[in-house]
C-alpha cells in the first residue's frame, strides 16, 4: 500500500508508541495511517469501533488492502461469537491469523463479551465520539483492556479542550478529570433561574494550552492540518438569504403557532429551539423556492445537508420535480448510486449520518439547507468535498432566514462552538 509522505511522517513520529492518536484533518487519510499502525503493532486480535455508517467502509478497506487479515462484523451475533472463539483458541500462538472485529459506538456497550478480551489493539475511528465521559459507550470503552490503542479523528474535540479527558485517559495519561479541568480549562460560576452552575469563560476559555499540547504529544498524539500537507482549492461561502415567515415571528412572540395543520408548542427551551429551527427550514416556502431556484441554476452535482426528516421529504419532492437523480445518506438509507454515476445528481445528506467519513469529492458544490447546531458536524460536513484529490474551487451555499435564530447559529458555528440551550436562552433574552 502506497502512503503519502505526511502519512509516513505520522507513523514515524509514533514509531515507539503503542498508544497513539492521529488527529489528522479531514481528507488526510487517517484510515490508512490507522490501519498501517495496527498492522505494525501486530496484535493477533484487533477491534475497530466506528460509526454505524462506516462499518462497511472499514470492512472493504481491509479486504482491499490486507486480504490475509480475517474480518468480522461484530454487529452480527454469530460473527461476534466466532470472533471471541478465535481469540480464545488462537491469540498468542505462533502463526495465528490476524483478526479485526468491527462494531459501531451505539452497539458496543451492549456486547459485554468484549470486556473478556485482553492483549488486543483497540482502534477508535472518530474518537471524539467518546468525549462525553458519562455516556454508556464511553464508560464501556474505558473498561476494555487493550494493550494498544489507536485514536483517529479530524476534529478531536471541535476545538473544545474540556472534552479531551477521556481520550487522554485511553492514551495512558493518568490525570484525574478534576485536575485536568483545573489545569487547562477556565470555568466561571453563573446563576440561572436560581441555580448555580459552571460554564467555560467566553473571553479566555483555556489556559496552559502549550503545556497541554506537549503532554498530548508526549502521549502519542500527532496533529496535522490539511494546509500543512497539501495545497487544496479555495473555499467560497455564499449566503442565500430569505425572509422569515409570519409563523416564525408568531412562534417567537407567543411560543405557539399552527402551521400546515400542525400545532407547534414551545413549552421548554428544547422545543422552542427545535421549532424555531424547523420554522426556518421546510416550513419556510421562500427557502424551499430558493433551493429549487439554486438547483435549477446548475447541472453539476449538489451535496445538500439537512437536519430533519420533513426537510428530506421536501427536498426530495423538489429534486423529483426537477427530474434530478437522487442519492441519500441518513439513519435509514445509504445510497450513493446516483452520486457516483450521474453528474447532475443531488445527494441529500443528514448531518448526523453523513457529515463524518464520506468522500464526496466528485462534487464541489455544497448546500446547507439548514444548519446543524454541532460545530464538529459543521466542520466535517465542509470537508466532504474539500479533501485530497479535489482540484476545483469548493462552493458552499448557506441558506439563511434573515434576522432569525439561524444567523446566531452560524455565528456560533464560525466560532467553533455548539449552539446549546444556554446560548439559545441568551439569544431569547437579547431578542426581547
Named regions from a protein language model:
Residues 45, 68, 81, 85, ...:
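Conserved P-loop NTPase motor "coupling/switch" region that bridges the ATPase
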Residues 84-87, 303-305, 313-316, 320-354:
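Conserved helicase ATPase core of P-loop NTP-dependent helicases/translocases
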Residues 227-321:
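Conserved helicase/translocase motor-coupling segment
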Residues 373-432:
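A conserved SF2-helicase RecA2
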Residues 1-23:
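Conserved pre-motif I regulatory segment
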Residues 54-78, 171-175, 323:
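Conserved helix-turn-beta segment of the N-terminal RecA-like "Helicase ATP-binding" lobe
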Residues 17-37:
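Walker A/P-loop
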Amino acid at each position: 500500500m502506497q502512503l503519502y509522505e505526511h502519512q509516513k511522517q505520522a507513523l514515524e513520529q509514533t514509531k515507539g508508541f503503542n498508544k497513539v492518536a492521529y488527529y489528522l484533518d479531514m481528507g488526510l487519510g487517517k484510515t490508512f495511517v490507522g490501519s498501517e499502525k495496527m498492522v505494525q503493532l501486530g496484535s493477533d486480535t484487533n477491534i475497530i469501533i466506528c460509526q454505524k455508517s462506516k462499518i462497511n467502509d472499514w470492512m472493504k478497506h481491509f479486504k482491499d488492502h490486507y486480504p490475509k487479515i480475517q474480518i468480522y462484523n461484530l454487529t452480527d451475533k454469530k460473527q461476534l461469537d466466532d470472533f471471541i472463539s478465535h481469540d480464545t483458541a488462537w491469540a498468542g500462538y505462533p502463526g495465528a491469523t490476524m483478526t479485526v472485529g468491527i462494531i459501531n459506538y451505539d452497539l458496543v456497550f451492549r456486547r459485554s463479551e468484549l470486556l473478556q478480551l485482553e492483549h488486543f489493539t483497540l482502534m477508535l475511528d472518530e474518537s471524539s465520539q467518546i468525549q462525553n465521559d458519562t455516556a454508556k459507550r464511553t464508560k464501556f470503552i474505558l473498561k476494555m483492556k487493550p494493550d494498544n490503542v489507536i485514536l483517529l479523528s479530524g476534529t478531536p474535540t471541535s476545538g473544545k479542550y474540556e472534552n479531551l479527558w477521556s481520550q487522554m485517559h485511553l492514551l495512558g495519561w493518568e490525570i484525574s478529570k478534576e485536575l485536568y479541568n483545573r489545569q487547562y480549562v477556565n470555568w466561571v460560576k453563573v446563576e440561572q433561574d436560581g441555580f448555580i452552575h459552571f460554564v467555560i469563560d467566553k473571553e479566555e476559555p483555556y489556559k496552559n494550552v502549550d503545556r497541554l499540547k506537549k503532554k498530548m504529544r508526549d502521549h502519542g498524539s500527532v496533529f496535522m492540518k490539511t494546509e500543512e500537507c497539501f495545497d487544496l482549492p479555495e473555499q467560497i461561502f455564499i449566503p442565500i438569504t430569505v425572509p422569515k415567515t409570519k409563523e416564525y415571528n408568531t412562534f417567537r412572540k407567543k411560543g405557539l403557532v399552527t402551521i400546515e395543520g400542525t400545532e407547534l408548542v414551545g413549552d421548554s427551551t428544547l422545543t422552542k429551539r427545535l421549532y424555531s429551527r424547523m420554522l426556518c427550514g421546510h416550513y419556510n416556502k421562500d427557502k424551499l423556492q430558493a433551493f429549487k431556484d439554486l438547483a435549477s441554476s446548475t447541472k453539476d452535482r449538489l451535496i445538500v445537508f439537512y437536519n430533519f426528516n420533513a426537510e428530506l421529504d421536501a427536498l426530495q419532492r423538489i429534486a423529483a420535480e426537477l427530474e434530478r437523480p437522487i442519492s441519500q445518506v441518513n439513519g435509514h438509507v445509504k445510497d450513493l448510486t446516483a452520486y457516483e454515476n450521474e453528474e447532475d445528481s443531488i445527494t441529500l445528506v443528514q448531518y448526523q449520518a453523513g457529515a463524518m467519513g464520506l468522500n464526496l469529492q466528485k462534487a464541489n458544490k455544497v448546500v446547507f439547507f439548514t444548519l446543524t447546531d454541532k460545530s464538529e458536524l459543521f466542520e466535517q460536513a465542509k470537508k466532504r468535498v474539500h479533501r485530497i484529490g479535489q482540484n476545483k474551487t469548493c462552493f458552499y451555499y448557506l441558506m439563511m432566514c434573515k434576522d432569525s435564530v439561524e444567523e446566531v447559529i452560524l455565528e456560533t458555528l464560525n466560532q467553533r462552538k455548539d449552539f446549546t440551550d444556554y446560548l439559545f436562552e441568551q439569544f431569547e433574552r437579547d431578542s426581547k
